[in-house]
Amino acid sequence: MSATVSLLFGVHAHQPAGNFASVVDEAHEKSYGPYLRTVYRYPQFRFSVHFSGWLLDYLLVHYPDDMALLREMVARGQAELFGGGDMEPVLASIPYRDRVGQITALSDRLERAFGRRPRGAWLTERVWEATVVPALADSGIEFVTVDDYHFVCAGQPLDALTGHFTTEEDDRRLDLFPISEQLRYRIPFAPADETVRYLESLATPGRAVAAIYFDDIEKFGIWPETYDWVYGKRWLEQFIEGVLASPVITPAHFETERAAAPTRGIVYLPTTSYLEMGEWSLPAAKADDYAALVAHHKDHGTYDRFKPFLRGGIWRNFLSRYPEANWMHKRMLGLSARVAALPQAQRTDEMLDLLYRSQANDAYWHGLFGGLYLPHLRRAVWNAAIALEHLLDAVDARAPAEARDVDHDGWTEILLHDAEVQAVVRDDADAALVEFASYALAHNFGDTLTRRREHYYRHMDAQEQSQAQHGGIASAHDRVAFRHAIGPAD
């Protein structure tokens, strides 16, 4: 058996519901459109793609020509569609019923638009908890991608992560593909020819090897310097041409690779996400300590050895770090329960759409990008939640005054409402007004955010980092840039 390597190459495209049209249009102009038009010219370059539901709808309406190219690539067997949660929720953070509903909604949307129902799914922010397995399996999903870091944390050796594994929860089976961290940091930042040579180096005589990549499509045009690098300087074309010219590399789909090779075995992954999330989800002081610990081991050459044990926080930590995010989340859970309790005849598609929009992950956390700190993203969640509550009250009236601990923080909240507004007061020493919602405007006037120290403040004295290794460009993870010099007034 000659030495070969299967390249499983996937890209993920997402914009949060409520994002500015100008932002989405720029993303399409610089990333989604050029990417699709480039890969279209290479029918033999098989790739996988995931679009979140709100973004997919936007592109189908505003950019039908580029979506027609994708439809043709799906039909000719070049593009493999991935599903997932329709409005890009962190599946672990929503109830089972909504996990199934969201996954099914996106699968339905893809089938209507492209004539194919996905068998693989993108896991939002690669947040893994074993509890998501039953909903994925029950929704017709057979495999997902997560980071190789997840497997390393489970004790798997890195050199074994060149194929798919199998897990189960409550006797529901799901196959797992480990995304290569090495490829995530090389593509598209290292020179194309160097990346192709790296892929070729993975080929092993007598052994089936898959090189697995699945990451944000925004790295191909939206991240700093990438538009000129990927399209102006032809990185993507050079990479594809190098892959297709290689006698060693075969572009493949996840589904066909899974059918061609047996599972590498059973695995049970710990609750985790990608490596960077472990730092971002910690409180600022602890994130500083964690970063220092990682730096110490890297400086002393022991990082790879101890990496499985150098885990930080988990995604849910954001809900304990930010009471504002926790309040949104627990209000959303309450609305989900009310929708589920309705008789089927009273439960409408509009209610489900608003519920799913309120579960969009972006406004509940933040890392490299603004997330929770962007008021228009929080506003979109609140708009959906308040509009949904208004619809629910019309068919399932509530008492005008209620007292309960909505957000599970140990304090009772008093909810006072009529047909026009709702005021929520916390029954503590401050009697703080934690929500003031207008149903006519579908707006929460109490949607504010307390200023807090963040872990990245430690970089304030750093200079902009734009120097890359190996003649490529720097990843956004390696950059520190300011709109203006930081001074005392800031």
Give the label of every model feature segment:
Residues 2-33, 40-42, 161-166, 170-174, ...:
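Active-site and substrate-binding clefts of carbohydrate-active enzymes
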Residues 4-96, 101-102, 117-123, 142-148, ...:
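Short, well-structured secondary-structure segments
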Residues 26-29, 97, 101-104, 422-490:
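Acidic-aromatic substrate-binding/catalytic surfaces of carbohydrate-active enzymes
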Residues 32-39, 67-71, 100-110, 133, ...:
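Generic structural signal for well-ordered alpha-helices
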Residues 33-35, 61-76, 155-169, 193-202:
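Alpha-helical scaffolding within the catalytic cores
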Residues 90, 146-161, 176-190, 194-198:
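Positively charged, amphipathic and often flexible ligand-engagement surfaces
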Residues 97, 112, 117, 122-167, ...:
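Gly/Pro-rich turn-and-neighbor structural signature
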Residues 98-125, 200-217:
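CE4/NodB-like, metal-dependent polysaccharide N-deacetylase domain
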